[in-house]
């Protein structure tokens, strides 16, 4: 289930992080896809490997006195390693009912490779994108 995906994407050394943009919170993380269970990987078409990274983005709209709600968004992402090589990451939407919307993408990584991620997020109904930037180092076995 998606709850399993959510749990797996927020564990380990790659703790979930977020940035606030007005009424919206963008949650993001990246981890080795080998940390995802076989069942979850199969259900969502994720290739499990120490040399594959998974990036996960979700967008929540915050409303006073109400729990945050997941919203659809246009999400584009790229990753640049420390030698300056940039890779576009193909993001795809994963939904479960109206309660959970995630955007996931994959890229190949090498041991101790560090990436600077740049993610452009435009929530549905908004015209200005939010720019989320973060750095992540990956370890392979």
Residue ranges and their predicted role:
Residues 9-15:
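Sec/Tat signal peptide C-region and signal peptidase I cleavage site
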Residues 135-141:
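Short beta-strand edge segments in extracellular beta-sheet folds
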